[in-house]
């Protein structure tokens, strides 16, 4: 069976891994998944990530905990294959009053909502992380 939404699958694996107190989660790799993982690491939501293998590359994300609780309290897919969500630069959402991050796909690549606002770019809202 083919996977319809690989990004939702990635977010669900992260959510389930943290619910089960796993150290790391593995999933099939893609350029978009690696870019999302890099953004989550830069924002401090995951400890690390690595791509393993050449032909069937796997993305391994090392989860981050603080005082035995997951750092990511909420991770939610916004734009999905059946309903894409695009926002202009002045319509970009602020997640949890600025405490969370909206992952935005812009013409200059993936970036956080703050970086997109600063660069004056809008785009597709991939997910919210808080």
Swiss-Prot record:
Keyword Cell division in annotation: no
PROSITE patterns noted in UniProt: RIBOSOMAL_S8
One record GO biological process: translation
A GO molecular function held by the record: structural constituent of ribosome
Cellular component GO terms held in the UniProt record: ribonucleoprotein complex; ribosome
Domain of life: Bacteria
Alphabetical UniProt keywords: Ribonucleoprotein, Ribosomal protein, RNA-binding, rRNA-binding
Matches recorded under InterPro entries: Ribosomal_uS8, Ribosomal_uS8_CS, Ribosomal_uS8_sf
Any one Pfam family match given in the protein's UniProt record, by short name: Ribosomal_S8
Quaternary structure annotation from Swiss-Prot or TrEMBL: Part of the 30S ribosomal subunit. Contacts proteins S5 and S12.
Family under the similarity heading: Belongs to the universal ribosomal protein uS8 family.
Reported function: One of the primary rRNA binding proteins, it binds directly to 16S rRNA central domain where it helps coordinate assembly of the platform of the 30S subunit.
Protein name from the UniProt record: Small ribosomal subunit protein uS8
Upper lineage: Bacteria, Pseudomonadati, Pseudomonadota, Gammaproteobacteria, Vibrionales
This protein's encoding gene: rpsH
């Amino acid at each position: 069976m083919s996977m319809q939404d690989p990004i939702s699958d990635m977010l669900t694996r992260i959510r389930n891994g943290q619910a089960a107190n796993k150290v790391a989660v593995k999933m099939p790799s893609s350029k978009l998944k690696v870019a999302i993982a890099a953004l989550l690491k830069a924002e401090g939501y995951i400890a690390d990530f690595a791509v393993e293998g050449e032909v069937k590359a796997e993305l391994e994300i090392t989860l981050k905990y603080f005082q035995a609780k997951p750092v990511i309290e909420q991770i939610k897919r916004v734009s999905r294959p059946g309903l894409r969500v695009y926002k202009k630069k002045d319509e970009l959402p602020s997640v949890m009053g600025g405490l969370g991050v909206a992952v935005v796909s812009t013409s200059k690549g993936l970036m956080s909502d703050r970086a997109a606002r600063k660069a004056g770019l809008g785009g597709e809202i991939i997910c919210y992380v808080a």
